[in-house]
Swiss-Prot record:
Protein name as it appears in the record: Large ribosomal subunit protein bL31
Species of origin: Wigglesworthia glossinidia brevipalpis
Family affiliation: Belongs to the bacterial ribosomal protein bL31 family. Type A subfamily.
Gene3D superfamilies: Ribosomal protein L31
HAMAP family per record: Ribosomal_bL31_1 (MF_00501)
Note on how the cofactor is bound: Binds 1 zinc ion per subunit.
PANTHER family tied to this protein: 50S RIBOSOMAL PROTEIN L31, CHLOROPLASTIC, LARGE RIBOSOMAL SUBUNIT PROTEIN BL31A
Gene designation: rpmE
Amino acid sequence: MKKKIHPMSLDILATCSCGNSLKIKSTIKKDILLDVCNKCHPFYTGTQKKLNIGGRVSKFKKRFDNIVYKK
């Protein structure tokens, strides 16, 4: 294998908008800012909101619920 062709892997600090900081390895040479992390993302915190608004199927059923089919 060729030597010295791989980029240097450095420890950098990734800071989230919520204030949480993570020390990670990366090939970039500067610290990064994250929008979300595992401390503030709704999936990981369990604070997801599921909106149950009428979709296409419920609109279809509501529209054609009163129709009587003749044989």
